[in-house]
Design a protein with these regions (language model features):
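A polyanion-binding, active-site-adjacent surface
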Residues: 1-244
């Protein structure tokens, strides 16, 4: 099992990879990669849709009006931003805040899955349709399943998945805000259940049986230890890689 320091260093490496990503055309119009922010050891993680204009300028998720509402809702359950980790399905802003395209979600999925594996939250709150459909692997919309916690295996980990309306959808619709607030109030009781059982790790392949000696065969002469196989070079350290 990785230590907290090891997980943070790996998370920084994924961040550096994302900063240089050119896997889809969104890199041509972004100002900043919006990787995610918060507590890298959080039990609770929020996953939204994509950065907006404010997020693209600042490089941080949920810093506009939807972010202020998210902070207010967290405060109502005795939490703050520093207690959780917040990310999006996309790390770059789609032009005009349009909906993400499927190929963009596919190109960015690696970064989100790496975050989920390294942060290892107990509970993930998906915010809105795109995050919910992506992590559930199901086309059912948020209006039908919001506020219904379930246990899901995502990548190598099993988590408590809790679909919620996106705060942006609740800004100007009182009925949606009421539903979002009611669902939010259940977060502490779901977190209190603790982490779900994790899947068994895959069994190691069996060791191959030693080869039987062939009668009458000439004995094999071992190759010189240094001539044929050179020593591998030393890996670069974090400073050389530009990690912080």
């Amino acid at each position: 099992m990785r230590t907290a320091i090891e997980r943070r260093e790996l998370l920084k490496a994924v961040y550096e990879e994302a900063r240089g990503c050119v896997a889809c055309p969104l890199h041509e119009t972004r100002t900043n990669v919006v990787f995610g922010a918060g507590n890298a050891d959080a039990d609770l993680m929020f996953v939204g849709e994509a950065p907006g204009a404010n997020e693209d300028q600042q490089g941080l998720p949920f810093v506009g009006q939807a972010g202020k509402l998210l902070e207010k809702l967290l405060g109502e359950i005795g939490m703050e931003r520093g207690d959780v980790f917040i990310a999006n399905t996309l790390k770059c802003r789609p032009p005009g805040n349009r909906d993400p395209y499927p190929h963009e979600l596919d190109a960015c999925r690696h970064y989100l899955e790496s975050q989920l594996e390294l942060i290892a939250p107990t509970m993930i709150c998906t915010l809105g349709n795109f995050a919910t459909k992506l992590l559930r692997g199901d086309p059912i919309g948020i209006s039908k399943i919001h506020g219904q916690p379930e246990v899901r295996t995502i990548g190598p980990r099993t988590v408590r998945l809790y679909p919620l309306y996106h705060p942006a959808a609740a800004l100007y619709t009182p009925s949606t805000l009421e539903m979002l607030r009611g669902d939010f109030l259940r977060i502490p009781e779901i977190l209190a259940l603790g982490p779900p059982d994790q899947p068994e790790p895959p069994a190691a392949p069996p060791e191959p049986a030693p080869a039987e000696p062939v009668l009458g065969a000439e004995p094999t002469v071992a190759a010189p230890p240094y001539d044929a196989i050179p020593e591998p070079p030393e890996p670069p350290d974090a400073e050389q890689l530009g990690l912080f």
